[in-house]
């Protein structure tokens, strides 16, 4: 693959998951229940997008290593991405299982976990940007040129 998909795909889960937490907060602050179904859909779609983006990142990992990106930098980004997915998966499970007697609903707990998820999402994005802007992951470099000499 000549152009990596991962940098294209990551924007969707970032936007969807962030908006899901925003909708949860708006619903709680404004006392409006109609934000919850939208937040649940955003969480689900954000998780789906996150899984696809993660798979694309794993697919692009070898190319980044071959381009000289340090493995420790890649692993840090990958670990944060997986932790982020795990936190948002917990939120999605909490949302799907709400209303069961054995899982009481705790909006403060949900929102607190959501804030942790947002912090992880931000850190994942930061270190992903580091891979691109510091190490040049996924950046095509021009072929070296030889200086032209004048004929005298």
PLM regions and their residue ranges:
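Polytopic transmembrane helical bundles with strong interfacial aromatic enrichment
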Residues: 1-152
